[in-house]
C-alpha cells in the first residue's frame, strides 16, 4: 500500500507517522510505502524525520520516500492524507487564507488527476478542510467525489470526551455522536442519536466549536496529537468491513442534497461504512427546526467559501 502524507515535516505528521507504520491504522499485516511531501524550505527538517523513521524500525514500513516534487509524491498512491496547507496568520482575512490554500490544493488536485490512480482515497485535514477538499476534488475529475473526505472525526472525538466527562457516558453510550456542517466555529454537535438521546446545552455546543481555538491558546499551536489520533480513527473506520452499523462523522460530497442541504459541497454528515473504503450517507434522521437552522447556517459559510474559490478559479482561467 502506497500512502502519501503532505506536510510531512509538520507536527501532525510527526504524531501520525508512528500510528501508520506500527499497524494501528491499516493493520499489522499491511506493508506500507510511505511518501512524505513538503516544501523546499522544510526539506532539511523532513530529512530529520526520515532519520527518525529509520531509527524506529517500524514493522509495517516497506519503503520510505521523502520529496518536494509532486510527481514523485502522488504517483501511483492508494491513500492521500493532505495535511499540508497555509496556516491562518494573525489578522489574516478568510479570503486571503482561501487564496493561499487555493493555490496549494489546486496543485494537489491536479497532481492527483495526473499521477494517482482513480481508486485513490483522499483525506483532507488542512484548513479550511471542507473547501480545500472541494478544490482538490474539482481538479481531479477522474477520481470519484466519494473518494474524497475531509476530517470531522476530531470534532466528533471532542464531543465523545464531553459526553464521557460531563454526562458520565460509557464508550458504548457515545456511539452515534455526530458533527454536522462545516469544520469551523459554526459546526453543530449532536448527541440526539446516541443511545441516551442526549440534548446538548448551548454551552456544550459552544465548547465543541471553540475547542480547537482553546487548544491553540493554551498550547501555542494547533492540535497535533489529537488530530493524528482522529486521522487514525477516520481511516481505520473507512477501511472497516461494514459490520459495525454505528454512524460516524465524515466530511463528504453532498451530491444528492441530503436533508435539503446545498449540493456540490463537502459537508460533515452522518455516514455508515458499507464495505472497506465505501460509505453511505445516513439520510433519514429527524432534525429539529432549531438544529436544522444551525446546520444551514454552517453550510452557508461553505457556500460563501465555494463562491470565493470560484472567483479565484475564474481569475486563473482568464
Mark where each language-model region is.
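Conserved NAD(P)H cofactor-binding loop of Rossmann-fold oxidoreductase domains
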Residues: 84-87
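Redox-cofactor binding/interface segments in oxidoreductases and associated redox assembly factors
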Residues: 80-82, 124
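Residues forming the Rossmann-fold NAD(P)(H) cofactor-binding site
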Residues: 14
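N-terminal Rossmann NAD(P)H-binding glycine-rich loop of SDR-like oxidoreductase domains
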Residues: 5-9, 17
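Rossmann-like NAD(P)(H) cofactor-binding subdomain of soluble oxidoreductases
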Residues: 93-161
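C-terminal substrate-binding/catalytic lobe of Rossmann-fold NAD(P)-dependent dehydrogenases
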Residues: 139-149, 154-318
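Conserved N-terminal Rossmann-fold NAD(P) cofactor-binding segment
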Residues: 25, 29-77, 307
Amino acid at each position: 500500500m502506497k500512502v502519501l502524507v503532505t506536510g510531512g515535516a509538520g507536527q501532525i505528521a510527526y504524531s501520525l507517522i508512528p500510528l501508520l507504520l506500527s499497524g494501528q491504522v491499516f493493520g499489522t499485516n499491511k506493508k506500507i510505502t510511505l511518501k512524505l511531501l513538503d516544501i523546499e524550505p522544510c526539506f532539511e527538517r523532513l530529512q530529520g524525520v526520515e532519520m527518525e523513521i529509520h531509527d524506529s524500525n517500524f514493522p509495517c514500513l516497506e519503503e520510505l520516500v521523502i520529496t518536494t516534487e509532486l510527481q514523485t509524491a502522488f504517483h501511483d498512491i492508494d491513500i492521500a492524507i493532505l495535511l499540508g496547507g497555509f496556516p491562518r496568520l494573525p489578522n489574516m482575512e478568510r479570503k486571503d487564507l482561501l487564496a493561499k490554500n487555493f493555490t496549494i490544493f489546486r496543485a494537489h488536485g491536479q497532481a492527483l488527476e495526473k499521477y494517482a490512480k482513480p481508486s485513490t482515497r483522499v483525506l483532507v485535514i488542512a484548513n479550511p478542510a471542507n473547501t480545500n477538499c472541494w478544490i482538490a476534488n474539482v481538479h481531479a475529475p477522474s477520481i470519484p467525489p466519494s473518494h474524497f473526505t475531509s476530517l470531522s472525526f476530531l470534532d466528533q472525538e471532542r464531543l465523545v470526551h464531553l459526553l464521557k466527562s460531563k454526562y458520565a457516558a460509557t464508550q458504548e453510550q457515545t456511539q452515534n455522536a455526530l458533527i454536522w456542517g462545516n469544520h469551523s466555529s459554526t459546526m453543530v454537535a449532536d448527541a440526539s442519536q446516541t443511545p441516551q438521546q442526549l440534548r446538548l446545552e448551548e454551552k456544550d455546543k459552544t465548547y465543541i466549536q471553540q475547542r480547537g481555538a482553546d487548544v491553540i491558546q493554551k498550547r501555542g499551536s494547533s492540535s497535533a496529537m489529537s488530530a493524528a489520533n482522529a486521522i487514525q480513527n477516520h481511516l481505520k473506520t473507512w477501511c472497516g468491513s461494514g459490520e459495525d452499523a454505528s454512524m460516524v462523522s465524515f466530511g463528504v460530497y453532498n451530491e444528492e442534497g441530503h436533508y435539503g442541504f446545498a449540493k456540490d459541497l463537502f459537508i460533515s454528515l452522518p455516514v455508515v461504512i458499507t464495505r472497506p473504503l465505501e460509505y453511505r450517507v445516513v439520510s433519514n434522521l429527524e432534525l429539529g427546526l432549531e438544529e436544522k437552522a444551525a446546520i444551514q447556517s454552517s453550510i452557508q459559510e461553505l457556500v460563501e467559501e465555494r463562491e470565493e474559490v470560484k472567483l479565484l478559479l475564474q481569475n486563473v482561467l482568464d
